Amino acid sequence: MSDVTPGSGRLTHAPQDHPAVKRARIGVLLANLGTPDGTDYWSMRRYLNQFLSDKRVVDISDWIWQPLLQLVILSRRPFSSGANYRKIWNHERNESPLLTITRAQTAAIEQALLPVYGDAVMVDFAMRYGNPSTASKVRELVEAGCEKILFFPLYPHYAGATSATANDAFFAALTRERRQPAARVVAEYFDHPLYIEALAGSVERVYAGLDHRPDVLVTSYHGMPKRYLMQGDPYHCQCLKTSRLLRERLGWAPGSIDVSFQSVFGREEWLRPYTVEHVAALARAGKKRIAVVAPAFSADCIETLEEINGEIRESFLHAGGEVFTYIPCLNDEAAHVAALTQIIRSNLSGWIG
């Protein structure tokens, strides 16, 4: 028999002055990379400083890196980054598309879970960098009575610079709680059948609306230094498997899907081929019509809307390409929401029926 009087929020065997006890709930906290609060210099500087000071992102000694970051990079980069963000900014909501889309994903997933769990499970989202912060959202979930939290980094592929640092922020937030909730972390889902199905469906829908079939589909993944692969990061292998599974699901012949890597910065060797160079090489080789999809991004963001659909598109066309088709991220498409919801339900097993 419960020691809580139904509907009262009070323990039946507790002193009269005992604080009200919240009904136990389960929290699902989605997480993505992050977004600046605005496109102005100081908003961009705060965001970039937090991002580029993360040791999971740039693992150079602070004695070397911080003077360079604070005195050189952050005196210039916020201007160019702000200009790029302004090209894609959601001016109606005064926020980045990533924030808009992640909020929509959260609402859709919560609605999908409602018929199964009722209000026993609440869904929210956080950003690793910028707002809403992971710590603030963990606090809100605990305050709402969540005694268990399922943390879900929305990265299909594991990487130290994405999944691991998101987990770091979550675990750090838990250390601030007097009563820590039970916690679970959702693993990468790069080969989950429903994720592959959602990817394939998005490709098929876009291709069905084209006048001419692209000569090749480029799967462009966020890049990382090559030495991370050598040190044991599984990201590269997982990206290759996603592209292979996508090709097999589509029923296409080997060689019809390429793999490349984008968002390279610094002088260090990164995973190759670089997308911006690869699409130009395709154009010069006679592949005049290409399509590009970004399977590693669960939501459209600066790297897809501005980099792929801007810089990478221009590289292809400048090299003689004729038709460049960008296939949007899965965002809050029904098939994507269904995939994420199923992954959540599997990870809630044992916590709730």
Predicted regions and their residues:
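Active-site-proximal alpha-helix that buttresses catalytic centers in soluble enzyme cores
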Residues: S2-G353
